[in-house]
Amino acid sequence: MTYSKDLSIVISLYNEDESLPELVSWIEKVMTAEGYRYEIIMVDDGSRDKSWEIIKELSERNPYIRGISFRRNYGKSAALYHGFKAAEGRVVITMDADLQDSPDEIPELY
């Protein structure tokens, strides 16, 4: 099987509009430094804040970012499931959007 990307980073989120720009910037910095072919799949699990609008803005600026939006909150398992289904990377890594997981650790996971 041939993969178009080295890594798929699946991020499930709910009401994380404030952390998304910083998280994406941090991931991009690490991916560029490591030279990975990657994608970021953000699954908005029915957020009531501006998370989906921010995901759309980020994906317009970076073709490596894709978003999936749920109409209501289905839970983290459902969000991850749909993120995994959409993933095109050889390796899939999950992260939370609240900056509790450091993108600096991604190379160790890969």
Residue ranges: model-predicted function:
Residues 1-110:
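Structured catalytic core of nucleotide-sugar glycosyltransferases
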